[in-house]
């Protein structure tokens, strides 16, 4: 399955200014916050990536999957890497996850591809 999401960078910037760390901690782990380096476009990209992952799994963010179950890191070449907690990898019987993020014209867009025998 494939999931896609697009986020307004300006909207994320308003939320960061208004709610500061409380906003970030709602959907990013401490290591993901460090990866974003206070860069609003990166924060928006990570948000879009987590939403795209939930859509690819056909559950959305909620009871079956939380933002913090989805983990983002970077490859040595700075490409996004995505995984889920062990519990969720098993729950969804995920074999592999692939991700891409792009930024342009004030938006961040993300695509996630999930290989699973359940979907």
From Swiss-Prot:
Binding site for Mg(2+): 5, 51
GO molecular function terms noted in the UniProt entry: holo-[acyl-carrier-protein] synthase activity; magnesium ion binding
Enzyme Commission identifier(s): 2.7.8.7
One record GO biological process: fatty acid biosynthetic process
Alphabetic keyword roster: Cytoplasm, Fatty acid biosynthesis, Fatty acid metabolism, Lipid biosynthesis, Lipid metabolism, Magnesium, Metal-binding, Transferase
InterPro entries: 4-PPantetheinyl_Trfase_dom, 4-PPantetheinyl_Trfase_dom_sf, ACPS, Ppantetheine-prot_Trfase_dom
Pfam family, one: ACPS
Top-tier EC class: transferase
Cofactor list: Mg(2+)
Stored Gene3D superfamilies: 4'-phosphopantetheinyl transferase domain (3.90.470.20)
GO cellular component, one term: cytoplasm
Catalytic activity: apo-[ACP] + CoA = holo-[ACP] + adenosine 3',5'-bisphosphate + H(+)
Compartments, record wording: Cytoplasm
Taxonomy, superkingdom: Bacteria
Job of this protein: Transfers the 4'-phosphopantetheine moiety from coenzyme A to a Ser of acyl-carrier-protein.
Family: Belongs to the P-Pant transferase superfamily. AcpS family.
Stored NCBIfam families: acpS, pantethn_trn
Protein name: Holo-[acyl-carrier-protein] synthase
Source organism (scientific name): Helicobacter pylori (strain G27)
């Amino acid at each position: 399955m494939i999931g896609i999401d697009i986020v307004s960078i300006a909207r994320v910037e308003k939320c960061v200014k208004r709610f500061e760390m409380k906003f970030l901690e709602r959907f990013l782990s401490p290591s993901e916050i460090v990866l974003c380096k206070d860069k609003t476009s990166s924060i928006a990209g990570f948000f879009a990536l987590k939403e795209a992952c939930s859509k690819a799994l056909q559950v959305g963010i909620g009871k079956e999957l939380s933002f913090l179950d989805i983990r983002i890191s970077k490859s040595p070449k700075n490409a996004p890497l995505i995984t889920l907690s062990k519990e969720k990898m098993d729950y969804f019987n995920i074999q592999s996850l692939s991700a891409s993020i792009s930024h342009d014209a004030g938006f961040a867009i993300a695509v996630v591809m999930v290989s699973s025998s359940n979907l």
